[in-house]
Regions:
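Non-catalytic accessory regions of SAM-dependent methyltransferases
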Residues: 1-119
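Conserved SAM-binding motif I beta-strand of class I
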Residues: 247-252
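S-adenosylmethionine
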Residues: 281-359, 371
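Conserved SAM-binding loop of SAM-dependent methyltransferases across substrates and taxa
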Residues: 233-246
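Conserved class I S-adenosyl-L-methionine
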Residues: 223-232
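C-terminal catalytic and target-recognition region of SAM-dependent MTase-like enzymes
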Residues: 335-400
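Non-catalytic substrate-recognition/targeting regions of SAM-dependent transferases
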Residues: 103-116, 135-206, 215
């Protein structure tokens, strides 16, 4: 059976030819042949030159997600096994694989498919219609590849409970893939223990992308007074406590997150030095300033303030506000760790926003480190969306 052919408009396809993996609806001139959304189609430029093959979905702004640049590639189980195997071999070289992101969508050439490994449990996100057809196969292939290294997976949980699926014509979904299992999973990262709630925690249950950024703050925290804002389940706060901080306060607006963070502190024997409070960070920081509170280290790990270009302006205001408030709470010569996980808040804009915040409160910033996401979340240079996490550590000094 012949595949449908997507032909691009004249002059379109430049991003695709330079390594991009997405074709948007406004780039398409015509679609010839019969297909059902989620099928594999061929892609040609305006002159009929073949550009590859991928999944089609005319319900989405991303009409085609490319799988291969060779239009003769057979997309079958053997094809997917190689992609899965390549992803795992890469992780074995670049990171501690006890808990890690095993598959990172487009950056592993498996568009829309994400898998996090927490000890012996896999958590899956399926974000695109085409890949959704293959998720059970991909899970079985991954279990097979891991088994070859002596890793037995005891359970798989799907966390596709995200709004982006609606843009693909799918409903959000979460549930077990295969047999049920206890959904609180204990992991160890940087020497710190966590209970990860893969069923009800945020996203897949734990933010593995900050692994080495959490490690980076440990050296600053011995005997320090630390404030960790947007703490979620306490990961930065617990790294500070593990490193010997004398007093750590973690703040989050979610009661569920604070309860889990408190349990994680107890799990590590840090309940005396690491405490958590449930409050909105934007409300709390001015109160702390009014009380004259000062900290050796302040950490800002907020959720994405923007998930589209249209809301970037408001996001800038939010990032500027929390950063200038945080700088006021840092002792002269103390440290600020600050980050953004929004792809649309790019490096340059984030840097400018922090600089503006520092000028507004008459602070000098001495950059200690600039970091991004952990290497199990690889940045594919031809896929801008794979680069999203910006993480700075600054020494904060008065400019007076």
């Amino acid at each position: 059976m012949s595949l449908a052919v997507v032909t691009l408009k004249k002059g379109e396809g430049r991003l695709l030819k330079s390594g991009g993996l997405w074709i948007f609806d406004n780039e398409v001139a015509s679609i010839m042949g019969s297909f059902v959304n989620g099928d594999i189609v061929l892609v040609h430029d305006f002159d009929g030159y073949p550009l590859g093959r991928g999944f089609i979905n005319t319900n989405s702004r991303i009409v085609v997600r490319l799988l291969s640049r060779d239009e003769n590639t057979v997309i079958d189980e053997k094809f997917f096994e190689k992609r899965v195997r390549d992803a795992w071999e890469y992780r074995k070289k670049v990171t501690d694989t006890s808990s890690c992101r095993v598959i990172f969508g487009e950056a592993d050439f498996l568009p829309g498919f994400i898998v996090d490994k927490f000890s012996d449990v896999l958590v899956v996100q399926s974000l695109a219609l085409g890949i959704d057809r293959y998720k059970e196969m991909l899970v079985e292939l991954l279990k097979k590849v891991l088994a070859e290294d002596g890793i037995r997976i005891c359970g798989v949980y799907e966390r596709s409970d995200v709004k982006v699926r609606k843009q693909e014509g799918m409903e959000p979904y979460k549930g077990f893939i295969g047999e049920e299992f206890p959904t609180l999973v204990e992991i160890v990262e940087n020497g710190v223990k966590y209970q990860v709630d893969v069923k009800d925690g945020q996203k897949t249950g734990f933010f593995l992308d900050q692994k080495y950024n959490r490690l980076a703050i440990q050296k600053l925290c011995k005997n320090a007074r630390v404030l960790d804002c947007f703490t979620h389940t306490g990961s930065f706060a617990l790294n500070a406590g593990y490193a010997g901080a004398k007093e750590v306060t973690g703040v989050d607006a979610s009661h569920l997150a604070v309860d889990q963070a408190t349990a994680n502190a107890a799990l590590n024997g840090l309940s005396d030095s690491v405490k958590f409070i449930c409050e909105d960070v934007f409300d709390l920081l001015p109160k702390l300033e009014e009380k004259g509170e000062k900290y050796d280290v302040v950490i800002l790990d907020p959720p994405a303030f923007t998930k589209s270009r249209s809301s970037v302006k408001n996001a800038v205001k939010g990032y500027r506000e929390i950063n200038l408030r945080a700088m006021k709470l840092v002792k002269d010569g103390g440290f600020l760790a600050t980050c953004s996980c929004s792809h649309f808040m790019d490096y340059q804009l984030f840097t400018q926003t922090i600089g503006q915040a520092a000028r507004n409160v008459h602070k000098r910033l001495r950059q200690v480190e600039y970091r991004t996401q952990a290497p199990d979340h690889p940045i594919l240079w031809s896929a801008d969306e794979s680069y999203y996490l910006k993480f700075y550590i600054f020494q904060v000094c008065s400019d007076r």
